[in-house]
Amino acid sequence: MAAYRLVLVRHGESAWNLENRFCGWYDADLSPAGQQEARRGGEALRDAGYEFDICFTSVQKRAIRTLWNVLDAIDQMWLPVVRTWRLNERHYGALTGLNKAETAAKHGEAQVKIWRRSFDIPPPPMQSDHPFFSTISKDRRYADLTEDQLPTCESLKDTIARALPFWNEEIVPQIKEGKRVLIAAHGNSLRGIVKHLEGMSEEAIMELNLPTGIPIVYELDKNLKPIKPMQFLGDEETVRKAMEAVAAQGKVKK
């Protein structure tokens, strides 16, 4: 029998997801479809009778607004919410703002997959002449970060390295106290948590596609190990289509 239950939600489609652009630390908002995805995710949790005690999210509005939509749908908007840059999306460096299909056409699908999905190879860093450099690096929400903490690009390994300490130091104690935890975050920061929970290899995590807006449920034992595979709250067809859409993002448009 499960000792704890954890729910993860990847943010709904953002305006830049819709345009197929590398987003990373750029603060794109949800698209109208993304708002609906988040709302449907919340309704799935409501219909299943889920209640929570504390929520965690990033400092990026697409994750925060996803959480708002979920909390609204389950009528638990009063819950405490902890926001942290450590749950931000991976920083895509110089690729930020570029169309993924155009980048694949220019550099080849294999190179784009390496940048997007390799475990420890970061994309080229964002230089000071990048159109979004100041927008991101000078944003006051990051004013307290040290120079070492503020990235100019990240691999998945880098993303996990800054997300996991927060998981271990802030989220795990809440779960072990019996708090029912909801995390609304991003594809790569959530993949870091999933990799840690399931003990997945670097190769396996590269191939994992988390769908947007669909609640992911983990039943955990007292050592926070999953007692069964992750479950998705949603009908099978919705889940399958969502995961296929995520996998197709870095391919050349036919």
From Swiss-Prot:
It comes from the Eukaryota. Its EC number is 5.4.2.11, 5.4.2.4. GO terms for cellular component: cytosol. Transmembrane segments: none annotated. The record marks 186 as: Transition state stabilizer. InterPro entries: His_Pase_superF_clade-1, His_PPase_superfam, PG/BPGM_mutase_AS, Phosphogly_mut1. NCBIfam families: pgm_1, PRK14115.1. Catalyzes the interconversion of 2-phosphoglycerate and 3-phosphoglyceratea crucial step in glycolysis, by using 2,3-bisphosphoglycerate. Also catalyzes the interconversion of (2R)-2,3-bisphosphoglycerate and (2R)-3-phospho-glyceroyl phosphate. This is Phosphoglycerate mutase 1. It comes from Gallus gallus (Chicken). The gene is PGAM1.
